[in-house]
Amino acid sequence: MGVVLPTLIVYAFLLFFSSSSAASLQRPSGGLGQGKKEIARSGLPGQIVDQKRLGGPGSVPPMCRLKCGKCEPCKAVHVPIQPGLIMPLEYYPEAWRCKCGNKLFMP
């Protein structure tokens, strides 16, 4: 009885730590939009950068074909929507727009 209890405690710790380390090493195999590459607008006007983002509701880019009129190429971009406040904010909601040249169009 004196050896059984410490042995059980050692096995419990080994089981706990091995399962927690395996869970932390495991990579997600697919959630909503993981690893999707999309085009996002940076804070500077006119600059567009590629970045990886996690998807969520509304994260699918719109079909921009025929949305920019005769202007080509018409591409979907993520842009911050700035409220009409005088003081700049640190966070702006984002929305999809269709961009051709320097013009943005509603999708």
Swiss-Prot record:
Belongs to the plant cysteine rich small secretory peptide family. Epidermal patterning factor subfamily. Keywords: Developmental protein, Disulfide bond, Secreted, Signal. The keyword Secreted applies. Pfam families: EPF. Interacts with ERECTA. This is EPIDERMAL PATTERNING FACTOR-like protein 5. GO terms for cellular component: extracellular region. The lineage of its organism: Eukaryota, Viridiplantae, Streptophyta, Embryophyta, Tracheophyta. Expressed asymetically in the hypocotyl, on the side proximal to the folded cotyledons at germination. Detected in developing flowers, the chalazal region of ovules and near the root apex, but not in inflorescence stems. Expressed in cotyledons, flowers, adult leaves and fruits. The gene is EPFL5. Disulfide bonds join 64-98, 68-74, 71-100. Residues 1-22 form the signal peptide. InterPro entries: EPFL. The keyword Oxidoreductase does not apply. GO terms for biological process: guard cell differentiation; stomatal complex development. Controls stomatal patterning. Mediates differentiation of stomatal lineage cells to pavement cells and stomatal development inhibition. TMM (AC Q9SSD1) functions to dampen or block CLL1 signaling. Acts as a growth-regulatory ligand for ERECTA family receptors. Promotes fruit growth and fertility. It comes from Arabidopsis thaliana (Mouse-ear cress). It is found in: Secreted.
